[in-house]
């Protein structure tokens, strides 16, 4: 319908504003973040060309697997646990070997490590390589300035910082990459080929594949909320929320997988103190109104992952923290901290009642 055509056009334009891009093309297609990862690699790097993946965890390793599945010549720089790849190591590597592209996960959802992608970009700009940023857990919550930094692709998904349901693979692509894709002629993809999608992104009234109308409408609303708040304000709020949550968790005896300079403002990957069992904790926390994810890979059973991104208000943060204290009390952990359980439960009930009235 003409209404949906206008909505998709607006969503595409808003997406570019969110990543501070004026020179490039935005793409919103049915799929998940992993599809966006595939699309980024397939359209920027030809078979047997060399790509360097900067990894600080599970999703950097996934990017390596995707690259290898397409026959790309892939090297990986793996950070130490709790850290990102140091910019100096990146500089040394790309001075020794030529790469078509460098890929970095901005925030690894499995480890909670945030990488200094702005610093990476300055180093990569000295070379001819493309810079691809996996922003699935960062875009819209942590600063990403595509044009100013010289980033060639920012890929992301709908369900994280945009605060809408999953189902969309989202990319913003530089003119350099579009021209490279045109020179490559054929690639081993059809649905993932940006050249098949480009005419639709320029004129959504055309057909290539059925769009997921409801998800795109939700995504548009998400972008409007973000731009109404203002991106600079949004970045500051994410930082303040993260600081509030981390301070409380530290006081309660928890610790984090990332070291201090690498803590992400969009989620925390939290190590359990002695005496707290993963399954019981997460089940009880859910019963108290807050769902957190378990650990991935080697961290399974050892950590929980708490997202604090999107349109999170401070009343929601306080509710989650009071629910956390109530959870710890009910599983018998508060005796070790010598905290006042009755005060905690009263505060929890007060926050819960306030939220009920707001609804």
Spans of model-derived segments:
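A glycine-/small-polar-enriched, mobile loop at the entrance of the PLP active site in fold-type I
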Residues: 1-28, 34
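Conserved beta-loop-alpha segment that forms the PLP phosphate-binding cup at the N-terminus of a helix
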Residues: 24-52, 56, 60-64
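Conserved active-site segment immediately N-terminal to the catalytic lysine
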Residues: 147-159
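Conserved PLP-binding catalytic core of the aspartate aminotransferase-like
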Residues: 255-287
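Active-site C-terminal subdomain of aminotransferase-like
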Residues: 159-247, 251
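PLP-dependent enzyme catalytic core of the Aspartate aminotransferase-like
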Residues: 298, 302-359
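Active-site phosphate-binding strand-loop segment of PLP-dependent enzymes
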Residues: 85-140, 153
